[in-house]
């Protein structure tokens, strides 16, 4: 592999040190290595902001691992940044001097505002959804809050609170009592109050979280079969569960890993304060943050206005998808959707996910015609899809699995991006669009009227179409039968 196409970003955080190594490929990035080590640097800061020798040694030990991988990468294509703890530490110079010797490249201590800007860039390059967003990143010793539209930030704040510092300050007795949470939340709201008005003034349509705390919440919700949107009600529910556990060392929540458990209650308290103070309705997980911001900055790639479209184009190229056919199926599915939208009330994001499934429905053919839907589902489940959340990927895979043949209803109910009934409706429309676009020519797609009454679909074809298309009639009869097996009434006229 040509080393000139390799780039590395290292983030010396207050809780963890991270390294990301990527390869530039066709205007996007392909992840080659991700290494994360819990160093808990912030825990080594005393009241005088002096970093302990033990904490520094933990950091240097981690950097020796990273250094081995950096030897293969040209120095101009490496960026190493240090954040909150090394901004605060009075003896940061000692740590950084040795860190630079170990890594063989410069280490830059960045300001809180620069950290916030880079986090926003990482989100803008990797996260789909509405353009106007609020980005929240709860680190070990600082929390970044950024508003922006597209690639442009409108306000940037870096606040002195984080999951490690709040752990040491409000959960040092290791008790998970209501009082501990109350104190931690009140303190976080006090820190937030001076910046809340400006954030609200700029406003946002979507809120995304880009930190270990939000990642942990996502993992918990996926494990417990909830949908992926984080809401205040869910956060309060998890807080009550933590309080029931009583002690930090006894904290057990389905989906919460041991590695994340230590700083979970403190991160949760900060997030509850942010939701309450800013009146956030819901939050989803970002596709990338600081490290991705560093990498895309080195590559000088423009922020794509529609990340999901870029992702679909890249995958279609990679798996040699017939884009004319993908567009034909998408156009037909969209036509069907418009005809039933008054009855089914499908939301815009669900429509977008249906059309994404149409664009990718034939990628399984690149493996083999036999079991192509299984291959398509497998590929989508395991590919990196910038712009799509983990739950959305799971829904896409489930739709592709059920694009033809008998329906696996349980898989449609196990995804948690949309309610089960909506997943069933999207699946029905996808199957019909694929069936009627099967001749692969625009002039051979019949004029179809589709009506929905609750779950009953009535499909009306031109007068003598069925009589002149015996194979088409056979395929439609078979589809009616498959849909009836799972109690989806389909009446063809």
UniProtKB/Swiss-Prot annotation:
The keyword RNA-binding does not apply. GO terms for biological process: guanosine pentaphosphate catabolic process; guanosine tetraphosphate biosynthetic process; nucleobase-containing small molecule interconversion. GO terms for molecular function: guanosine-5'-triphosphate,3'-diphosphate diphosphatase activity. Keywords: Hydrolase. It holds the Pfam family Ppx-GppA_III. Pathway: Purine metabolism; ppGpp biosynthesis; ppGpp from GTP: step 2/2. The keyword Hydrolase applies. InterPro entries: ATPase_NBD, GppA/Ppx_hydrolase, Guo-5TP_3DP_PyrP, Ppx_GppA_C, Ppx_GppA_N, PyroPPase_GppA_Ppx. Its EC number is 3.6.1.40. It catalyses: guanosine 3'-diphosphate 5'-triphosphate + H2O = guanosine 3',5'-bis(diphosphate) + phosphate + H(+). HAMAP family: GppA. Belongs to the GppA/Ppx family. GppA subfamily. Catalyzes the conversion of pppGpp to ppGpp. Guanosine pentaphosphate (pppGpp) is a cytoplasmic signaling molecule which together with ppGpp controls the 'stringent response', an adaptive process that allows bacteria to respond to amino acid starvation, resulting in the coordinated regulation of numerous cellular activities. This is Guanosine-5'-triphosphate,3'-diphosphate pyrophosphatase. It comes from Salmonella typhimurium (strain LT2 / SGSC1412 / ATCC 700720). The gene is gppA.
């Amino acid at each position: 592999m040509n080393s000139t196409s390799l780039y590395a970003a290292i983030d010396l955080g207050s809780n963890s040190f991270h390294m990301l190594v990527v390869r530039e490929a066709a205007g996007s990035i392909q992840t080659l290595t991700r290494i994360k080590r819990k160093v808990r640097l912030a825990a080594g800061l005393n009241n005088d902001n002096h970093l302990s020798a033990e904490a520094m040694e933990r950091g240097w030990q981690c950097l020796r691992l990273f250094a081995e991988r950096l030897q293969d990468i040209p120095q101009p294509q490496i960026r190493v940044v240090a954040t909150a703890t090394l901004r605060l530490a009075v003896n940061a110079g000692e740590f950084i001097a040795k860190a630079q010797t170990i890594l063989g490249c410069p280490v830059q201590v960045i300001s809180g505002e620069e950290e916030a800007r880079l986090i926003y860039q990482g989100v803008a390059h990797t996260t789909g959804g509405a353009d106007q967003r609020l980005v929240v990143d709860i680190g070990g010793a600082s929390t970044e809050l950024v508003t922006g539209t597209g690639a442009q930030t409108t306000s940037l704040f870096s606040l002195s609170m984080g999951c490690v510092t709040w752990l040491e300050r409000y959960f040092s007795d290791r008790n998970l009592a209501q009082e501990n949470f109350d104190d931690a939340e009140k303190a976080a709201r006090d820190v937030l109050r001076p910046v809340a008005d400006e954030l609200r003034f700029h406003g946002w349509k979507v809120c995304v979280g880009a930190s270990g705390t939000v990642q942990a919440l996502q993992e918990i919700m996926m494990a417990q079969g909830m949908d992926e949107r984080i809401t205040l009600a869910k956060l309060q529910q998890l807080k009550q569960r933590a309080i029931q556990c009583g002690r930090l060392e006894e904290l057990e929540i389905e989906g919460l890993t041991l590695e994340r458990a230590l700083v979970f209650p403190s991160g949760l308290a900060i997030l509850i304060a942010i939701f309450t103070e800013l009146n956030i309705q819901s939050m989803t997980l970002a596709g990338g943050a600081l490290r991705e911001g560093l990498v895309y900055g080195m590559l000088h790639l423009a922020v794509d206005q529609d990340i999901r479209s870029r992702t679909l184009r890249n995958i279609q190229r990679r798996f040699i998808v017939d884009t004319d056919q993908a567009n034909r199926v998408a156009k037909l599915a969209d036509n069907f959707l418009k005809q039933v939208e008054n009855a089914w009330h499908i939301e815009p994001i669900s429509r977008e996910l249906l059309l994404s499934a149409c664009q990718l429905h034939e990628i399984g053919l690149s493996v083999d015609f036999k079991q192509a839907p299984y291959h398509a589902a497998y590929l989508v489940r395991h590919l990196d899809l910038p712009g799509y959340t983990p739950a959305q990927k799971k829904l896409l895979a489930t739709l592709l699995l059920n694009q033809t043949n008998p329906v696996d209803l349980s898989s449609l109910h196990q995804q948690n991006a949309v309610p089960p009934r909506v997943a069933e409706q999207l699946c029905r429309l996808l199957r019909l669009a694929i069936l009627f676009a099967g001749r692969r020519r625009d002039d051979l797609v019949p004029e179809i009227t589709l009506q929905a009454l609750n779950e009953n679909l009535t499909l009306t074809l031109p007068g003598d179409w069925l009589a002149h298309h015996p194979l088409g009639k056979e395929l439609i009869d078979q589809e009616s039968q498959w849909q009836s097996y799972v109690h989806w009434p389909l009446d063809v006229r």
